[in-house]
Structures are given as structure tokens and as C-alpha cells.
């Protein structure tokens, strides 16, 4: 015989309110912020309905739980705005890549380093990639010297996150801002 379908109960997001609060007594704060002390839950709900607002559990872990008389819709809206603002302020760290060759000219090197400094100021990580072509693979020490030079030039503003390593025909190093 088949078992009957039993869906998981819907979890409400946000604080408990009105009849969802299942404790005998609460500490009540009214809409003006005045503390009414320890009150029975029925009395608190009656006061909230009288004011045309909702009874919302603010601190559920307290003994007794702290409840406030507020407009639940307005409270949820304010919480959504706060969360959106926090998300907007978060910055995702990107990895910017700077590609070079082992026999790079001095001016080209300076231009690449200026770009790397700009990336560090923006808070991004920088991946320095050296590509070896043809017979350059025989002179990997030149690539290692160049990456050491990059490391020395950025020592005040960046730290090495991954040391230089060779992968195929490319040598890579990742730097992160301090």
C-alpha cells in the first residue's frame, strides 16, 4: 500500500507574530517604545489589536520573550531594505589577469605594473601569467626572475597568494591586496 503524501510544513520566514507566539507571558514594548513589563500573551495581543497593529516577537531567546507592537508589513519591508543595502555594499573579489612574456621591455613592464596597482587599489586579486613560446621554454629562469621582480615591486601593497608555478607553457603567480 502506498504511503500518503506528506509535504513538509511551510516554514515562515521572519519573526513570529500575533497568534504564532506560543508562550504564556511576554515582555511587552508598545508602538511608542514604552516598556510595559511582563504581560500575558492574551493581553499583549488585545493591546496590539486595539492599536490596529501586530504583536511581533523581537527577542525570542529572552526569558520571557520580548515582543513589540508594530506594523508587521512595515517591519518586513524595512528588513528587506536593510538586506538589499547590505548586498549592495558587498564587493565580490575578482581575479584580474595580467599577461606578459619573459623578454618584456621595460616600458611595457611599467604599463603592466601600473595596471596591477590599479587592480590592487580596487581590491581585486591579480594573476600574473607568463607565456613561453618556442625555445623560451629552455630559459625558464628568466620567467622566474621576472616574477620575482613583480613580487618585489608590489611587496608594500600586495602579498603572494600562490607562488610562481609552471603549468604547461605558462608560469603563473597570484597576488592579493594587503
From Swiss-Prot:
Q: Taxonomically, which superkingdom?
A: Bacteria
One GO biological process term is: ribosome disassembly
Known InterPro entries for this protein? T_IF-3_C_sf (IPR036788), T_IF-3_N_sf (IPR036787), Translation_initiation_fac_3 (IPR001288), Translation_initiation_fac_3_C (IPR019815), Translation_initiation_fac_3_N (IPR019814)
Q: Does the keyword Cytoplasm apply?
A: yes
Spell out the SUPFAM superfamilies in the cross-references: Translation initiation factor IF3, C-terminal domain, Translation initiation factor IF3, N-terminal domain
GO MF terms here are: ribosome binding; translation initiation factor activity
Q: Name one Pfam family in it.
A: IF3_C
Quote a single Gene Ontology cellular component term.
Answer: cytosol
Tell me the keywords, alphabetical order: Cytoplasm, Initiation factor, Protein biosynthesis
- Renumbered to this chain, region (Disordered) spans 1-20
Cellular location(s): Cytoplasm
Q: Does the keyword Protein biosynthesis apply?
A: yes
PANTHER family for the chain: TRANSLATION INITIATION FACTOR IF-3 (PTHR10938), TRANSLATION INITIATION FACTOR IF-3, MITOCHONDRIAL (PTHR10938:SF0)
Functional note: IF-3 binds to the 30S ribosomal subunit and shifts the equilibrium between 70S ribosomes and their 50S and 30S subunits in favor of the free subunits, thus enhancing the availability of 30S subunits on which protein synthesis initiation begins.
Per the record, the similarity remark reads:
Belongs to the IF-3 family.
Quaternary context: Monomer.
Q: Which HAMAP family match?
A: IF_3
Q: What NCBIfam families does the record tag this protein with?
A: infC (TIGR00168)
- Return the protein name: Translation initiation factor IF-3
Query: Taxonomic lineage per UniProt?
Result: Bacteria, Pseudomonadati, Pseudomonadota, Alphaproteobacteria, Hyphomicrobiales
